[in-house]
């Protein structure tokens, strides 16, 4: 199986961070931006760094953009360019287009024109920061939909020394514990009699409201 290839269009702070992380993870990444200075900054980071206008169809074709597994439109300071680039990528047959949105209205437009995934980096980071500030237990969150997530959090004190069935997480809230990380061990799909311990890290799936309620328990 071939390694996934990514293209990141728009090398601002978000785009550059994305290029760095994907490259660090061992993937081939092409960085594209109309600004020569930004491209020069990524020459030593990306697999390929190209100065190009993403709204030029012939240029995108010449770059073989449709051959990339995922193309991320990370343009953040020009909504028109962001939207038109997304449209062009879909018209060129790119398999998966991920587009960065500035706000809800922008996101709705991106969804309407065919973006496969719309992301809100600033909003999501603000939510994550807010939750980490108000909760002593919250660690990480992966959004599966607008209403459901997989969340990682420390065992609240009120749940420590109780078995999963005794906590009522699944029966009362519909929250499923996928795994428990205990020191260097990971208990995958723990049974109902598994007892939670203080310091355990719980990985659970459920509605955002229920998960947030649990992480805020004392």
Language model features with spans:
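Cytosolic regulatory regions of ion transport systems
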Residues: 1-218
């Amino acid at each position: 199986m071939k390694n996934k290839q990514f293209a990141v269009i728009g090398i601002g702070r978000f785009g550059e961070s994305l290029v760095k992380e994907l490259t660090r993870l061992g993937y081939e990444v092409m960085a594209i931006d109309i600004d020569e200075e930004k491209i020069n900054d990524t020459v030593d980071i990306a697999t390929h760094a190209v100065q190009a206008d993403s709204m030029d169809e012939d240029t995108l074709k010449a770059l073989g953009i449709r051959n990339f597994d995922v193309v991320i439109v990370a343009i953040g300071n020009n909504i028109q360019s962001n939207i038109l680039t997304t449209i062009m990528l879909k018209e060129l047959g790119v398999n998966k287009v991920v587009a960065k949105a500035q706000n809800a209205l922008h996101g709705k437009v991106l969804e309407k024109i065919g973006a496969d995934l719309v992301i809100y980096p600033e909003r999501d980071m603000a939510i994550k920061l807010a939750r980490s500030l108000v909760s002593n237990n919250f660690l990480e969150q992966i959004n599966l939909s607008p209403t459901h997530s997989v969340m990682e959090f420390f065992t609240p004190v009120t749940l420590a020394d109780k078995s999963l069935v005794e906590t009522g997480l699944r029966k009362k809230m519909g929250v499923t514990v996928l795994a428990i990380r205990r020191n260097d061990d990971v208990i995958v799909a723990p049974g109902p009699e598994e007892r939670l311990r203080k310091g355990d890290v719980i990985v659970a799936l459920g509605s955002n409201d229920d998960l947030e309620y649990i992480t805020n328990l004392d």
